[in-house]
A protein has these predicted regions:
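Short, small/polar-rich loop/turn modules that mediate ligand/substrate recognition or access, typified
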Residues: 181, 186, 241-243
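Short C-terminal tail/terminal secondary-structure segment
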Residues: 2-4, 153, 231, 242-257
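Substrate-binding pocket helix/loop in short-chain dehydrogenase/reductase
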Residues: 100-101, 105-113, 211
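Alpha-helical segment proximal to the catalytic Tyr-Lys
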Residues: 129, 178-179, 239
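Residue(s) in the substrate-gating loop at a strand-loop-helix junction
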Residues: 148
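Conserved glycine-rich cofactor-binding loop
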Residues: 11, 18-19
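Active-site helix of classical SDR
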Residues: 124, 165, 173
C-alpha cells in the first residue's frame, strides 16, 4: 500500500502545461517524481516554465499547437522520438470564447471545438501506440481529459462553444474508455469548477467574492486540489476506474448538476 498513490518514474505529457490547470497538474507530477513533458503554443513560455519546474524534478518542453491534426501528430511524433512508452496523457489544452447568441462568430465556435474536442481525439489517437506499450493488466496507462462543470450544467455566461465542447469531452471520455479498455488504457475526466487561472482571471476579479460565498465549500480551488486529483487518476489507486467524470468544484455541481 506504500506506493498506492505513487507516480514516481512514470512518463507523462500535459498539454497546455505552461499555465492554469495544466501547470497545476504538471507541477504536481514533477514534484511527485514523474518525467513530465509539457506542451503549449508559445515556445518561449513553454521553455521557461519547463526550466522552472525542472528545479524540482524532470520537465521537458515540447511546444505544439494541438488544435490541428498536424500539430497533434507532430507532438505525438516528438514524444515518440524521445520515449519508448507513455504512461500518462493529460489532455488539458483548451480555449474559450464568450459572445451574445446573435453575434457569436462561426470561426470562434470552430476554434474552440477544434482545440477542446478534436485536439483530444487526435492526440489520444496518435499516442495510443505509446500508451499501449506502457500498459499492463496490473498497471494500465492513463488518459486524463480536462472537462469543466460548464459541461455538466448550463453556465451563466454566454460561452456557447465552450460549454458544448466540454460536454463533448465528457462523453468522448466515456467512449474512449470503452474502446481502449482492451488495450489496458483507462480514460477519465476532471471537470474543474472555479480555479485561479488566466482563463478564469477576469471572472474571478469581477465575481470572486460571490463565487466564494455561493460555493458549498466556501472557496475557489487551489493548485493542490487539482494536482491531487490528477495524481490519484494517474496512480495505482485508480487502476479499476475508467470512464468517469470527476467534478473538482467545491460542491457546485451537487447544487446545479
Amino acid at each position: 500500500m506504500n506506493d498506492l498513490f505513487s507516480i514516481e518514474g512514470k512518463v507523462a505529457l500535459v498539454t497546455g502545461g505552461s499555465r492554469g490547470i495544466g501547470l497545476m497538474i504538471a507541477r504536481g507530477f514533477v514534484e511527485a517524481g514523474a518525467k513530465t513533458y509539457i506542451s503549449s503554443r508559445k515556445a518561449d513560455v513553454c521553455d521557461a516554465v519547463a526550466a522552472e519546474l525542472s528545479k524540482s524534478g524532470t520537465c521537458i518542453s515540447l511546444p505544439a499547437d494541438v488544435g490541428t491534426e498536424a500539430g497533434a501528430k507532430g507532438l505525438a511524433e516528438a514524444i515518440a522520438d524521445g520515449e519508448t512508452r507513455l504512461d500518462i496523457l493529460v489532455n488539458n489544452a483548451g480555449a474559450t470564447w464568450g459572445a451574445p447568441l446573435a453575434d457569436y462568430p462561426d470561426d470562434a465556435f470552430d476554434k474552440v471545438m477544434n482545440l477542446n474536442v478534436k485536439g483530444i481525439f487526435h492526440l489520444t489517437r496518435f499516442l495510443t501506440p505509446l500508451l499501449a506499450k506502457a500498459a499492463s493488466d496490473e498497471s494500465p496507462s492513463r488518459v486524463i481529459n480536462i472537462g469543466s462543470i460548464d459541461g455538466l450544467q448550463a453556465p451563466t455566461m454566454e460561452t456557447y462553444a465552450y460549454s458544448a465542447s466540454k460536454a463533448a469531452v465528457h462523453h468522448l471520455t466515456r467512449v474512449m474508455a470503452h474502446q481502449l479498455a482492451g488495450q489496458r488504457i483507462i480514460v477519465n475526466a476532471i471537470a474543474p469548477g472555479p480555479f485561479q487561472s488566466k482563463m478564469m482571471a477576469e471572472t474571478i476579479r469581477t465575481f470572486g467574492d460571490n463565487m466564494r460565498a455561493t460555493n458549498p465549500l466556501g472557496r475557489i480551488g487551489e493548485p493542490s486540489d487539482m494536482a491531487g486529483t490528477a495524481i490519484f487518476l494517474a496512480s495505482k489507486a485508480s487502476a479499476y476506474i475508467t470512464g468517469v467524470v470527476i467534478p473538482v468544484d467545491g460542491g457546485i455541481s451537487t447544487r446545479h448538476g
